[in-house]
Amino acid sequence: MRPTIYYRWWWLMRGDDVTYLQQQLAAKGHNPGTIDGIFGPKTRDAVLAFQRAVGIGVDGIVGPETWGAIEAKVQDPGEGLNYIKFTRGRTEYYLLKAEKNKIKVDILGEPRKLQKLSSMAKGYRAAISGMFFYNTAPIGTLLRDGWTWTTEHPNYWTVDLDNWKLYEKGFSAITLLREGVKNCISGQPKLLPSTHRPDSASLEGRGPRCALGWNAGKIFALVADGRSSASAGATFPEMAQVLRELGATYALGLDGGGTAQMIYNGRTVNNPSDGRERPMPMGLGFKMK
């Protein structure tokens, strides 16, 4: 077990573990300064930047949580798309981080049909579960290539998947089509830039969660496991905080619970709370442009 490393200006920690830490930070793109085995201000700043990037507690202290993230295997299923698993508190998280200029996000599924995400995601680098649904219809506004197959809901926000613009509640498919939107999905609650309460009390507690975030250059898909001894689950405000620390400026909650799922490189990487895949009407697929 590696020691906890932290910064004290009057006595700088040093040694082989610090050297290893500096090497790992440099390999992950966070400049620790000179790799000299001394935990100085430059190395602490690199730790802070790393903690923000992976969505763990940002305190500059290299304890068990940060060591776990440092030594986690970050996997790249294709240029511009990274996958990482990390733990924060008592919850396991799964993250896809995509470059907008290299990765396209497609709406998967067929109207009035429930399918496993693994079936819908064939041929894609990665995929996540999508919109809330009732029977076989997604709830909210969904447009794919200008066609809709959803049950609209006035309390759902909508994101344009081509231009990555977030629309407030109440925009109908017809209104969005007039705005030039061709591909969009809906969800709730809005998480960023400000976090709203969900419209259902059943969504306010801790549980398996799924969310989509983005900024000017990146897309973040985040899934949290829950309802198990291995992972307590997350609240939507906690999902918002993780996405904010990752750098997202906008974020939207998606269907969670037993539906929350992430696929990377052809396999489910999280642990759906039902113990198996739950069929759903649609999902989101990530592929190279």
Across the structure, where does each feature detected by a protein language model lie?
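Acidic, Ser/Thr/Pro/Gly-enriched interdomain connector segments
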Residues: 1-37
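Conserved hydrophobic/aromatic packing and binding residues within compact polymer-binding modules
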Residues: 22, 47-50
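Phosphopantetheine-attachment site and its flanking helix in carrier
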Residues: 38-44
